Amino acid sequence: MKHLRRSHTIGRREFIKTGALAGLGVGLATLTGSASASVPPTPRVRRYAPLGRTGMKISDISFGADQLTPSQEDLVHHAFDLGINYFDTAETYAGGESETALGNALRGKRDKVFLTSKTLAWPDTKKGEIMQALEGSLRRLQTDHVDVYFNHAVNDVARLKNPEWYEFAETAKKQGKIRFTGVSGHAGHLIECLDYAIDTGKFDVILCAFNFGQDPHFYQHLLGGFDWVARQPGLPRVLEKARSHGVGVVTMKTLMGARLNDMRPYERGGATFAQAAFRCVLSHQNVDALIISMTSRESIDEYLGASGSQRVQAEDLPLLEKYARLNGTSYCRNACNACEDACPAGVAIADVMRTRMYAVDYGAMRMARDEYAMVARNAEACLSCSAKPCAGACPHGLKIDALTAPTHRLLTSA
């Protein structure tokens, strides 16, 4: 109890709250006092974390460039000036403009930063096609190598069994075009894919969805229910497995939908929901760092307010609980996939809801439409469906049948 530097006694309800984070390794011993007790320090990176066995030490809160365009290069400069040294992009982000913007903004700084990019390598993708994708990324990034090259958004182990990927990786490493390889994912077969990737011994980094709502202890104690990780108890195990194998762990989707405006009325004493969510993720002993979409100077400053925090603060818990209560039944836990078999037409419901999140919650319409265009079984069938077989399929109360058809219209309209 001495670690909880509070001016008043902890009541039973708050004691339960602190215990709720035990599953993340952030119980009473790691709770700190109020952030409002002193003037907040100037935002900047305050911790550089070893990324698994790679030897890289990266900013604990790093730059997600999924929405970056050439008109926003100043954001990259601002982030760099505040100490961010890890920049994550992909060939598909902003139609390639994200890589172009990073290449322009980081010209002359390449030896001071780590760059990652990604490509979608399918079960039948050839080595030469992957190499061609990499070389396109290198041109746009204006560099001769990337530090980590990811097989992007993997949700099918068959994509990890393609020998062409491993032949490509070996050649690209020998040529000095990539230093390390990774796998990223955030969908229903995440655990299976990460397990396989780690077991191969050929992936150096994993990038996966992880947020405070994915800890069963949080929901069990605070809300009397479970989030999807309780349906997939392998996630904490896989993160621990990655750590034991020297595989670096970077997390994304750390804001559980990122509905930040919902929380502004409840933020007090300088602490914000985003900072609380980041502290929760970074306090997990098997997480090295997180990436987050950085779309304004103000958001970068806000996010970096949580850098260096490997402990959850006392005022974080009410914010996390409030967010979960406000959004628990309207947020799609993409990797839950409990609804997978509900649609006789095979609509990829979780992917449809994920792209809706990009559009409605993130305000990233371009990214949402680009991602939706890649969903093999989108919600077009929902336009003519009257039976609504998906109604009630979400164990968390998401009204799937009322959202899929409008999402299709939203993301395909001219």
Regions found by a protein language model. Give the residues of each.
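N-terminal secretory signal peptides
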Residues: 1-10
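N-terminal export leaders
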Residues: 10-31
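C-terminal segment of N-terminal export signals and the immediately downstream linker at the start
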Residues: 30-61
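Conserved, mostly hydrophobic/aromatic
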Residues: 51, 63, 87, 102, ...
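Distinct, well-ordered alpha-helical segments
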Residues: 76, 99-107, 127-138, 158-167, ...
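Active-site groove signature of glycoside hydrolases
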Residues: 141-157
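Beta/alpha (TIM)-barrel catalytic core signal, keyed to glycine-rich beta->alpha loops juxtaposed to Asp/Glu
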Residues: 154-347, 351-354, 361-374, 402
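Short Fe-S-cluster ligation motifs
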Residues: 361-389, 413
